[in-house]
């Protein structure tokens, strides 16, 4: 049998191996001069990496050695890492990133600072664009909810049936604008005079005329004429005394203001007596 000679083994020689080892150590000692790699050097290094990746392709080392590399790791160590890593996994270097794929043209190289800057630039317009529609949607919702609430409140008020006492209260407010305790109060003599005038000449002393004359509401005159209640003699006497005290109190107040002359019956209601007749 004729011995078969390997072509790749025949190409290997001692001078070639020594030259490759010396060049790899020299490039490792030099190290990278700049922190950032150039795209051209990274591309050529990736091509050399793909050629080294194949089994028994030692001839490609000569082509890789002719190219000056800027990697921080020595080629021998890179070759060991490449042999251990799988073909589909990416390999990381000091300043960049090389992703190996099945397609030879897919070589991605980028720096962390450049990637972060690109991400910030891309996220800034997206954030502003996302915030504006959200604000517009919230304002539109508020505007749409406001008329809904107002219309619902109006409908609920209109649909809700009022109680009898509420209807009566509204009617009394329209009739008695001054309320149940008006400042103008009619004395018992005035009440009897209103009844007497209306009984003598009802066509002449009508309700509006009497209301204008006594300065009260027409509803008050109507109720006075309509009421059939009459006080007893005892109640009339109590009422007369009460109205006399009221008259003297008002007279004393007007005397203090200088509008009326002093009166003996009104002296007991004066504030002067309350202030100066206190026991020491």
Swiss-Prot record:
Functional summary from the UniProt entry: Required for respiratory activity and maintenance and expression of the mitochondrial genome.
Locations listed in the record: Mitochondrion
InterPro entries in the record: NGRN/Rrg9 (IPR010487)
Low complexity bias (residue ranges): 101-114, 124-135
Gene Ontology, cellular component aspect: mitochondrion; nucleus
Chain residue ranges for the region called Disordered: 63-166
Protein name, as recorded: Required for respiratory growth protein 9, mitochondrial
Span of the transit peptide along the chain: 1-45
